[in-house]
A protein has these predicted regions:
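Glycine-rich, charge-decorated loop segments at or immediately adjacent to ligand/cofactor-binding or catalytic sites
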Residues: 107-112, 202-225
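Glycine-rich oxoanion-binding loops at beta->alpha junctions
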Residues: 112-165, 178
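Conserved anion/nucleotide-ligand pocket segment
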Residues: 225-297
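Conserved functional hotspot residues or short segments at active or partner-binding sites
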Residues: 322-428
């Protein structure tokens, strides 16, 4: 049954207060149409609850009596935008004793690639350990000797009450739906550390903002291209929630499985658009400001391995792209002539305030996704790179290791550099995606 039918049949019963037959006749035609769309939007919106909401509602709590660590960032909020860290800190039935932050930090303020050091949160009265600094993986002392590790560190009050260790780890971060987004790597590293130290981990599930049906891009070739932007052999667009990924990693990829519990979503299905969940979009990182960014990211992140600007240093990162030597109109016309599904390109000029081509006027385009269901980000970016090479063969360059690491394979870049046909490579990728789809099936939680 289509989602629209399923939702429309239930919630609206009887007349709408204040809009009887007589008053309805007095409402203008366009007002009736507008109201109709508003009502349709209301009934099509699901009542999705996250794993964080489930944890707070559980009575008794599964964390009762434990000293708890929390891996989180600004996306760790309830449906009502309350900080999960603050809510957990206020609990009396268990004790939140430490926070652990991925790339960009617990506070989400650090730029991409910037290392984050140890910090102290004076409001929560808790240590903030960085998992994107000297280490990507929680060390033994971070988990089992907290007081001994941090006491006397700058910024910590002399009277601070510090726990010795954690008895449980909680992971609550909104992913962006792409293998190259480092939070997936952090999840794997945290699970690995918890398994090594006998610490159970609870993963609080959140929706995949790109949905759970479509997969794209190569399945990463391991171990050759394993890194934090490709921690396990999964596709670039994996179509899984963090809870499902945790189950897959635990069953198939980790050398030592963790004591894993996933607190699932309620009300979410694989075909549900993020905008239909009723959940607020909180920036997962400084350069992921909107859902539009997340949609184009699985492909556009590949531009980090080229001399094209991927739009960092603008208010539309990954949607904008270009270079000082590109003529925006020429490139845009050539891209639109490809008639790629679900996307239109608009001529754009921009001057990045940081990152590649900082302070230089760049010609290029902005990606406008017109049909998210048909849009394929990875294929679009590969066609984009083919077009740039055809128009500017002496200007486009690739940073080999970076591009291959992001792509998860070294087989695609040489084809782009030489102008060869991508069709055989894309066909091979489709075959790998079918195999991965079969691999992931036992670990999926939602229809």
């Amino acid at each position: 049954m289509p989602h629209s039918e399923a939702f429309i049949r239930g919630p609206i019963r009887g007349p709408i207060r204040g809009l009887g037959p007589r008053s309805w006749g007095r409402v203008g035609r366009w007002s009736r149409i507008a109201l109709g769309w508003c009502l349709l939007a209301t009934v099509l919106q699901a009542e999705v609850r996250t794993g964080a909401d489930a944890l707070l509602a559980a009575d008794p709590s599964p964390l009762r009596g434990r000293r708890v660590g929390l891996v989180t960032n600004p996306t760790g909020v309830t449906r009502d935008l309350e900080s999960l860290a603050l809510r957990l800190r206020q609990r009396k039935d268990f004790e939140l004793v430490a926070l652990y932050g991925p790339e960009h930090g617990v506070r989400g303020n650090a730029q991409a690639g910037d290392k984050v050091g140890f910090q102290w949160d004076p409001v929560l009265g808790l240590p903030l350990f960085s998992l994107y600094g000297k280490t990507f993986k929680p060390t033994g002392p971070m988990l089992t000797n907290i007081a001994g590790m941090v006491r006397g560190s700058p910024g910590i009050p002399t009277n601070a009450v510090l726990a010795e260790r954690i008895d449980a780890m909680v992971f609550d971060i909104q992913d962006a739906g792409s293998r190259a987004y480092t939070y997936v790597g952090t999840l794997s590293k945290v699970m690995e550390a918890c398994a090594e130290h006998g610490i159970p981990i609870w993963v609080l599930d959140r929706p995949n903002p790109l949905g759970g049906v479509v997969m794209e891009g190569p399945v990463l070739e391991a171990p050759e291209w394993v890194s934090l932007v490709g921690i396990q052999p999964i596709p670039m667009r994996h179509g899984m929630t963090v809870g499902e990924l945790a189950r897959l990693f635990n069953a198939r990829f980790l050398a030592r499985p963790a004591a894993l519990t996933v607190l699932p979503l309620t009300g979410w299905s694989r075909s549900l658009e993020f905008a239909q969940t009723g959940l607020p979009w909180v920036m997962p990182s400084p350069n992921m400001p909107t859902l539009d960014t997340a949609r184009v990211y699985p492909g556009q992140v590949l531009l980090e391995g080229t001399n094209l600007s991927e739009g960092r240093g603008t208010t539309r990162p990954f949607e904008l792209f270009g270079a000082p030597w590109i003529q925006g109109r020429e490139l845009t016309d050539a891209l639109n002539a490809l008639r790629l599904p679900g996307v239109v390109f608009r001529e754009a000029w921009f001057t990045p305030s940081f990152s590649k081509h900082r302070g230089e006027l760049c010609g290029g385009s902005q990606i406008h996704v017109t049909d998210a269901a048909r849009f394929r980000s990875v294929t679009t970016t590969l066609r984009l790179l083919q077009t740039v090479r055809r128009l500017y063969p002496d200007r486009l360059t690739f940073q080999g290791p970076t591009f291959d690491r992001l792509m998860g394979t070294a087989t695609v870049r040489p084809l782009l550099e030489s102008g060869a046909d991508l069709a055989p490579a894309l066909a091979r990728i489709e075959g790998d995606l079918k195999a991965f789809d079969a691999l992931r099936q036992p670990h999926l939680l939602y229809p």
